Amino acid sequence: NDTVDKAFLKPIAQGYEAVVPQPARSCVNNIFNNFKDVWSSFNSFLQGRAFDGINSFGRVLMNSTLGIGGCIDVASMKGVPRVVNDFGITLGVWGFEPGPYLVLPFLGSSNLRDGTSTVAWFAYDYTPPYAPIFAIDNIPVRNSIIALAAIDMRASLLSADEMVDRIALDRYAFIRDAYIQRRAALVQGQSVDPNTTPEGLPKY
């Protein structure tokens, strides 16, 4: 993963950050986060966390309308925070243990529980939170949006990358521990910054 990232993904993300104005990048990031909020709301209800589910659904409604299709994160401006959630967290709430830490090809940090849920969704040809994008029939358009989502995600980690390189003695161990701590906090229902671990470490 590191080899592919350093040779391909990271340079593209750096170019994207250098060329695309910050307001445009924020718009793109907010739109993709709006898709994630739909998936977050669904999983919150599966976990019995109705307040979080209503919160996320309200964010989607607010940002999709007042926020011009999700381009502007009006909900956060109004004090409605993002709730990070996915099916791996749902399985954790239901009592499934995380299992060993894994690094999935192209997808990065995971564990046996989260990785299994990801593979299962792919096997059923359903890829939340971006299922509506994968349903687009126009292949060039669909692939372009998927590529943009990947670039946006990688660009959002550039500053975290710099911090890890600066302070981590063992990059692998640092990222592993950050991932494990963050996922455990999310399963326990702790409120975390969408872009960091509970201890302020970058999200991986």
Regions found by a protein language model. Name each.
Residues 26:
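A small/polar active-site loop signature that marks catalytic segments
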Residues 10-23:
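Membrane interface segments of multi-pass transport proteins and intramembrane proteases
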Residues 94-204:
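A structured, mid-to-C-terminal "fold-capping" secondary-structure block
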Residues 30-112:
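Mid-length scaffold segments of soluble, non-membrane domains
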